[in-house]
Amino acid sequence: MPTRKSRLFPDLKPQNEHERFMLEAIKEAEKAIDKNECPIGCVIVKDGRVFVRAHNLRLTKGNAICHAEVTAIDKACRKMGDFRLNDCDMYVTLEPCTMCAGAIIQSRIRKVYFGAYEPKSGAVCSCNDIFNVIHGHNHKVEYEGGLLEEQCAAMMKDFFKNIRIRDSKKD
């Protein structure tokens, strides 16, 4: 069954299953853009299918923890009736922050695939290495970064460029 195309990247054709799922996360990020939210999208995959979708909702909900990853984990746990998501993988457009990395560990996500690296606050490998430094948990999260990195980074860059342009017009 064909899915709708990305609005920002209509010619993007996924080369494999991982790119296909990241494209779904990109579509979620586009929903965030429509709400003037930071363009971060996330999908959790279970049994080779998208299980839940989420995007940033911090401004919309007025809640600092409504990051795409935390919202997706919450949806998946409610849908499964369990906090253990060990047979699930996460695809997110930006390297998770410390809070989200902690939630990923606690929910026992099997593997995280992220798009753009986050040099200012990325907690998977850019600024911190949360998946490898938190001890005392019986779960180790695997990860792979840089999946459709160019597109994911472009969304972030364009979003913040547009904010600067908008803010400069206020002066």
Where are these regions (language model features)?
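Residues at secondary-structure transition points
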Residues: 12, 16, 38, 59-67, ...
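Zinc-dependent deaminase
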Residues: 1-33, 99-171
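Short beta-strand scaffold segments in enzyme catalytic cores
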Residues: 40-48
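Short beta->alpha transition motifs characteristic of CBS
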Residues: 51-58
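Short, basic and Ser/Thr-rich N-terminal targeting/leader segments
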Residues: 36-40, 86
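Residues that line or immediately flank small-molecule/substrate-binding pockets and catalytic motifs
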Residues: 58, 92, 116
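Small-residue (primarily alanine) positions within well-ordered alpha-helices
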Residues: 25, 29-32, 42, 52, ...
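Helix-adjacent hinge/juxtasegments
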Residues: 62, 66, 70-107
